A protein has these predicted regions:
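Acidic/His- and Gly-rich active-site-bordering loop/insert found
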Residues: 1-60
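Conserved hydrophobic/aromatic beta-strand scaffold that supports enzyme active sites
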Residues: 17-21, 119, 142
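Buried hydrophobic positions in well-ordered alpha/beta secondary-structure cores of metabolic enzymes
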Residues: 20, 32-35, 72, 92, ...
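Solvent-exposed residues in well-ordered beta-strands and their adjoining turns
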Residues: 21-23, 123, 144-148
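Glycine/serine-rich anion-binding loops at beta->alpha junctions
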Residues: 56-70, 151
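Residues forming anionic-ligand binding surfaces in small-molecule and nucleic-acid pockets
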Residues: 61, 140-146
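Acidic/histidine-rich catalytic neighborhood of metal-dependent amide-processing enzymes
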Residues: 65-136, 140
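Acidic-enriched catalytic cores of C-N bond-cleaving enzymes acting on peptides and small amides
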Residues: 152-157
Length: 157
């Protein structure tokens, strides 16, 4: 949401999110998440894909998050081909606003996560290959104050 100068609130849409639900009635359900946006705006020079060498691709979003989505797909193929695959349900969410704070997808994420046995996000590892257990975040806040305008030095009552 965004607060206008007059105090009214606008909803900010950040694109369409992809949700796939498989076996929603299963007793064991998982949530797998990722994102499709990148940190680079459309007019940034880093907008093309380049093969650096066979098997090594460079471009916006290749590691964060397309590499993670490829790992997610491999994990889902493993689930589907396992003997228990038919008993496991899952939702896959690929949101379109992760790099800008997930403002429009946060309620969707919370709703999909409810009641799941596990939720897995497929962000890339740290540069040395170790698991990223946490990352810094960001927040944007707006406050609406109502009342009568006054200044103690001019109107002490």
């Amino acid at each position: 949401e965004a607060v206008r100068a007059d105090g009214s609130i606008d909803t900010i849409e950040r694109g369409q999110h992809l949700v796939v639900s498989v076996r929603p009635g299963a007793n064991l359900r998982l949530l797998l998440t990722g994102h499709m946006d990148t940190v680079f705006p459309a007019d940034h020079p880093f907008q093309s894909l380049t093969w650096l060498e066979p098997g090594v691709l460079n471009g916006p979003g290749v590691a964060d998050m397309k590499g993670g989505i490829a790992v997610m797909l491999a994990a889902l193929q493993a689930v589907e081909s396992s003997p228990l695959g038919a008993t496991i349900g899952y939702d896959v969410l690929i949101n379109s606003d992760e790099e800008v704070g997930s403002a429009s997808s946060a309620p969707l994420i919370a709703g999909l996560a409810a009641g799941k046995a596990a939720a897995l996000t497929y962000e890339p590892a740290l540069p040395d290959g170790t698991l990223a257990g946490e990352r810094g975040g960001s927040g944007n806040f707006s406050i609406i104050v109502t009342g009568r305008s006054a200044h103690a030095g001019r109107n002490p009552h």
